[in-house]
Structure formats: C-alpha cells, structure tokens
C-alpha cells in the first residue's frame, strides 16, 4: 500500500485537502439538505396551490355578493320611490281633506244662519 492509500485519496478544496471519505460525507450531507429543501418547496407549493384555490373561490363568492348587493340596492331604491309616491299621495289627500273641512265649515255656518238654535 502506498502513501495515497493511507490518506484515502486526497482532494484539493478551498479550505485545504480533504479525504475522499470526508468529501463523500460532505456531498451526502449537502444532498440530504437539498432533498429537505426540495421536499419543503414541494409542500409549500401544494399549500400555495390550495391557498390560490381558496382565494379564487372567495373571489367568486365576493362577486356573487356584489351582484346580490346590487340587486338589493335596486330593490331599496324602488321601495324608496314607492314611499315617496305614497307620501305625495298622502299629502294630496291631506290637502283634499283640508278643503273638505273648510267646505263643511262653510256649510255649517250657513246652516246656523238658516236655522237659528232654539
């Protein structure tokens, strides 16, 4: 066995020389880290897809609510117009009743003049 067998095949690295075994362990550790990162990214990707689906669903629900609110707004506006028309009608009826009362008052005065109380 030679000198290089004894050192387990040396590799030149930035930090100095390392054995093939150390280099393999380093590569394995890095590969495990990469696998963890890939797994985490895949999980986060799935979570993101689920969140996107939820957001899309909520967007559709919001659109439906907006349509519903618009319809309710139109109904409220129509009811307001009805109330306004009824108010005008009541006001007109009130004026008519005033005129009727005035006429009745005039009739009453004339009746009092024609038939004095006994």
Curated annotation (Swiss-Prot):
Question: Which InterPro entries does the record associate with it?
Answer: DUF16
A Pfam family recorded for this sequence = DUF16
The UniProt entry, under SUPFAM superfamilies, shows:
MPN010-like
Highest taxon, organism lineage? Bacteria
| Stated family | Belongs to the UPF0134 family.
Record-given protein name: UPF0134 protein MPN_287
In its UniProt entry, the species of origin is given as Mycoplasma pneumoniae (strain ATCC 29342 / M129 / Subtype 1) (Mycoplasmoides pneumoniae)
Q: What is the lineage of its organism?
A: Bacteria, Bacillati, Mycoplasmatota, Mycoplasmoidales, Mycoplasmoidaceae
